[in-house]
């Protein structure tokens, strides 16, 4: 995935009300950017941190910029971390189409945002003529508290637990269901559950895995030009 327009470097002032961040451009211009991330973003919000913003245009844009990347030292030295949680679905779909996810290869058709469960939409639905459909739910991973070990979630997520239960129901119905955890931290060697931050999600994950829901970890290469899935990493649960 390439960014459609060049990103603009800035310095973070603060993030507040979940979806807003104040920043200062290199020329001293102060602005407010949209934050497409409802999580706690632990370790990614230090005042003065270097950030990269995407200019927004069009009648629907309420703010002139959206926050895309932040430079953070998560134990392996400064690196770029993707904070926009709107991108993972696109990135995973691209990776599946490019054959970078062997576990999800070979399906004839791919659809996105298909209604299922209780007032939910599955991120990716893979279909074939000679095997059951595969329901794929994607989660963005941007938490790292120990070098190399990415974690999910970074705060309590009742919605995430609901998705796990709905995937388990699909397995019971004879379908295939897969949770994909996408690390937007390139130094991640594996992904683990942050059970201390959301014990309920950990329990829901265990129940889903016992029911037959699969779990896959992916990692990305990130720079100011774009983000690309580079391959799979262990999802340890």
Curated annotation (Swiss-Prot):
One MF term from GO for this chain?
Answer: DNA binding
Quote the Gene3D superfamilies the UniProt record gives: 2.40.50.580, 3.40.1350.60
Which residues, if any, are the signal sequence?
none
* Family named by the database record: Belongs to the SfsA family.
HAMAP family in the cross-refs? SfsA
Full protein name = Sugar fermentation stimulation protein homolog
């Amino acid at each position: 995935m390439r960014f459609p327009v060049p990103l603009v470097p800035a310095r973070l002032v603060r993030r507040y009300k979940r979806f807003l961040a104040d920043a200062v451009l290199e020329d001293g211009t102060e602005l407010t950017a949209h934050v497409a991330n409802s999580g706690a973003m632990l370790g990614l919000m230090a005042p003065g941190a270097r950030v990269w913003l995407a200019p927004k245009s069009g009648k629907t844009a309420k703010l002139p910029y959206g926050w895309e990347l932040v430079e953070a030292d998560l134990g392996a030295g400064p690196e770029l971390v993707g904070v926009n949680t709107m991108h993972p679905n696109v990135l995973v779909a691209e990776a599946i189409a490019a054959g970078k996810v062997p576990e999800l290869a070979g399906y004839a058709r791919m659809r996105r945002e298909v209604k299922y469960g209780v007032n939910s939409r599955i991120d990716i639905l893979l279909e074939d003529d000679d095997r059951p459909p595969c329901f794929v739910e994607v989660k963005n991973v941007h938490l790292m508290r120990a070098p190399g070990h990415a974690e999910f979630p970074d705060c309590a997520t009742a919605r995430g637990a609901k998705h796990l239960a709905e995937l388990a129901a699909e397995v019971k119905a004879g379908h295939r269901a897969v949770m994909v955890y996408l690390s937007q931290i390139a130094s991640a060697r594996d992904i683990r559950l942050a059970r201390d931050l959301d014990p309920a999600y950990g329990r829901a994950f265990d129940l889903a895995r016992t029911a037959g829901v699969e779990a896959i970890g992916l990692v990305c290469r990130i720079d100011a030009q774009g983000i690309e899935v580079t391959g799979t990493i262990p999802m340890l649960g």
